[in-house]
Design a protein with these regions (language model features):
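Ser/Thr-rich, low-complexity intrinsically disordered terminal regions
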Residues: 3-16, 25-160
């Protein structure tokens, strides 16, 4: 009887080890994917296309499910850029990655899981609009977070 129990205990131990290894593997692969920095920016007046997955929004996409309106200019480029920066700062959990005369790039970090989302603003001075792109670095669905972020930033920008 004791030998059977020891055998059952060994099986349980091996199952526990396998589960811990699998969970660790998922955690490590998620961590690596979250840290991988995508190639972004503006090429010929266009932000990078949105991915095939539904976890992104852009003012320059042709996909109606991911489309958002560009931000209108304020008085000039500088006041517009200041307004965008103010809205981003108010939103929080953000780090600026790149700033150029006509471009801002940020990384927003989600609350619970600490996922990184890339957010870009392209200041189209000729058309007096600011194009926007927000995309999750990993996963399939963002449960609407990128659109919510856009709405919050847009509303704050328009009110201030």
């Amino acid at each position: 009887m004791k030998r059977i129990r020891n055998r059952k205990d060994k099986i349980k131990m091996w199952i526990a080890i396998v589960v811990v290894v699998m969970i660790s593997g998922v955690f490590i692969s998620t961590l690596i994917a979250n840290k991988k920095v995508p190639k972004l920016g503006v090429v010929d007046g266009k932000l990078t296309d949105t991915p095939q997955t539904p976890n992104a929004v852009s003012s320059q996409t042709t996909d109606e499910d991911k489309k958002v309106a560009p931000f209108p200019y304020k008085e000039n480029l500088q006041s517009t850029k200041d307004g965008i920066k103010l809205a981003v700062k108010a939103y929080g959990d953000v780090k600026i990655i790149e700033e150029k005369a006509d471009y801002l790039r940020y990384v927003f970090t989600t609350g619970l899981m600490r996922y990184n989302d890339d957010v870009e603003f392209y200041f189209d001075d000729q058309n007096k609009v600011v194009h926007f792109r927000s995309a999750s670095r990993m996963g399939y669905s963002d449960m609407g977070l990128n659109r919510e972020r856009y709405n919050a930033l847009y509303d704050y920008y328009m009110k201030n």
